[in-house]
């Protein structure tokens, strides 16, 4: 869990904002939402496969745009 040391004469709002930012970077909220309900192993595999397909298509689109710019 992210920890934030409050500096001397630092307003509470600033420390809270730093804490929220560190939680966001660590992915705490997304992890909590993901673990909120049980997900079947088949659903996990299906989600990961869909993410892999999405990454692959995104990579292909990037390469296609790069190729089109050259000519």
UniProtKB/Swiss-Prot annotation:
PANTHER family with a match to the protein in the record: MITOCHONDRIAL 28S RIBOSOMAL PROTEIN S21 (PTHR21109), SMALL RIBOSOMAL SUBUNIT PROTEIN BS21 (PTHR21109:SF22)
One GO MF term attached to the UniProt entry: structural constituent of ribosome
Biological processes annotated in GO: translation
InterPro entries: Ribosomal_bS21 (IPR001911), Ribosomal_bS21_CS (IPR018278), Ribosomal_bS21_sf (IPR038380)
Name of protein: Small ribosomal subunit protein bS21
Keyword Ribonucleoprotein: yes
One GO term describing the cellular component: ribosome
Keywords, alphabetical: Ribonucleoprotein, Ribosomal protein
């Amino acid at each position: 869990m992210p920890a934030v040391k409050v500096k001397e004469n630092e307003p509470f709002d600033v420390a809270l904002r730093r804490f929220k930012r560190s939680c966001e970077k660590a992915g705490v909220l997304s992890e909590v939402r993901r673990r909120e309900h049980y997900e079947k192993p088949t659903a996990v595999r299906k989600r990961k496969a869909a993410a892999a397909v999405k990454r692959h298509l995104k990579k292909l689109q990037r390469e296609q745009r790069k190729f089109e710019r050259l000519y």
